Amino acid sequence: DIHFSLTFDEETACIGAPLLIKELKKRKITNGICIVGEPTEMKIIDSHKACDEYTTFFEGLAGHSSKPDEGVNAAEYASKYVNKLMSLRSDLINRKPKDSIFTPSYSTLSIGGIFGGIAHNVIADKCHVNWETRPVNKEDGIFLNSEIDKYAEKLLSEMKKKYPDASIKKKIIGERIGVFRVCR
């Protein structure tokens, strides 16, 4: 049998494929070949990187910008977090597998947005960072999350010295496993 299936909303919420998988299971369709037409422009591929998306929320203490020592600036801590992610991006490049079939050949990392603060003269009490990684292997995803989580604990410790209710919370938006070649 040949089955045609289409998904939707794969660039923003990524909800089409999980719904399709549930439906295929319900109908007991377990075929082993899939052709994905986007973003490859119908070029046949036999593997793809994983895609892990996160939003990290920072909560500090607002105050007037003329008295920075009386607040905990969530935007400043979010900036430190982003800087750490960027340094980890260099590590990911250095960890690239010698036999990688991907372009680029290493796990990628992207900051999709930084949002926080309400005015120039107000210490930002809230900020969040949208970011994603496209690991070429499971180990890179584990490495990246372990390193950034340790760093977030360090930042939170600093924040809590000034404001015990400060918080840093990483929310998983989606973690989609990669598909890797079985044969070369």
Stretches found by the model and what they are:
Residues 55-184:
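Metal-dependent amide/peptide-bond hydrolase catalytic core
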